């Protein structure tokens, strides 16, 4: 038995969460097309051929604009020192930009661990462009212990990735039970489900300005469990967008979130959603701490 912790890093919105969900074959991390979707280090655990791979989905490393962004970048950078392997993800269909190089600089500053580069969406480029991409990688990002190419939906590349990770796993250890695919609590998963539905249904500044908190859980024998959840935004205008005309948007969010939560729990529930305004909450340390977004 071998096991190891693998930090999955990259610029925001490069596809880290999609990769981990695919690897684990479970929905561990929420996914949207909005940058900054992942706010915490989330573990996805894969047991395969007597090996245990613990993939850590990190927030996209970027230059922070507020305390929440600072927290997200700090925990992503900190994990670089603690893992066994760094898995850097880039998009083959896009030029390597300043965001990718910013991530590479943080890796160089904070870790000497083995580095594997996963180049996603290689099915969107030609063989000639693939050769050019390899040269671009060497020029802008430097050397890696291994470079793996994968298709956009990972129809190929996964087995090659696991094979590349194997030599760096630690012998004789196992960190989690075979039936465990994440270390996230059920309540945390529930709040992430609600946030995902908002991300998928709203636009502009809303996705970055939303926080979710379970404020009450009622369990009575013979009755459905009831979850009351606050949705925090920073402006009255944002509150109006989430509620929608005659409450239509909030109802749609609630219906979709409740359905997925019921699938998670295996039982019917009541779900109450309440939209609250907390001015500039992303800049306020006490509130961020209340939500679990400030390191002790």
Swiss-Prot record:
Keywords: Cell inner membrane, Cell membrane, Cytoplasm, GTP-binding, Membrane, Nucleotide-binding, Ribosome biogenesis, RNA-binding, rRNA-binding
Cellular component, GO, one term: plasma membrane
Gene3D superfamilies the record matches: 3.30.300.20, P-loop containing nucleotide triphosphate hydrolases
Era-type G domain segment(s): 2-171
Ranges for region G3: 57-60
Assembly and oligomerization: Monomer.
Ranges where the record places region G2: 36-40
Gene that produces this protein: era
Positions of region (G1): 10-17
Organism the protein comes from: Fusobacterium nucleatum subsp. nucleatum (strain ATCC 25586 / DSM 15643 / BCRC 10681 / CIP 101130 / JCM 8532 / KCTC 2640 / LMG 13131 / VPI 4355)
Gene Ontology molecular function: GTP binding; GTPase activity; ribosomal small subunit binding; rRNA binding; small ribosomal subunit rRNA binding
PROSITE patterns xref list: G_ERA, KH_TYPE_2
Residue ranges of the region described as G4: 120-123
Topology with respect to the bilayer: Peripheral membrane protein
Annotated stretches, region: G5: 150-152
Protein residues bound to GTP: 10-17, 57-61, 120-123
A biological process from GO: ribosomal small subunit assembly
Localization annotation: Cytoplasm; Cell inner membrane
Protein name in the entry: GTPase Era
PANTHER family: GTPASE ERA, GTPASE ERA, MITOCHONDRIAL
Ranges where the KH type-2 domain occurs: 202-279
Function: An essential GTPase that binds both GDP and GTP, with rapid nucleotide exchange. Plays a role in 16S rRNA processing and 30S ribosomal subunit biogenesis and possibly also in cell cycle regulation and energy metabolism.
Family: Belongs to the TRAFAC class TrmE-Era-EngA-EngB-Septin-like GTPase superfamily. Era GTPase family.
Classification via HAMAP family: GTPase_Era
Pfam family, one: MMR_HSR1
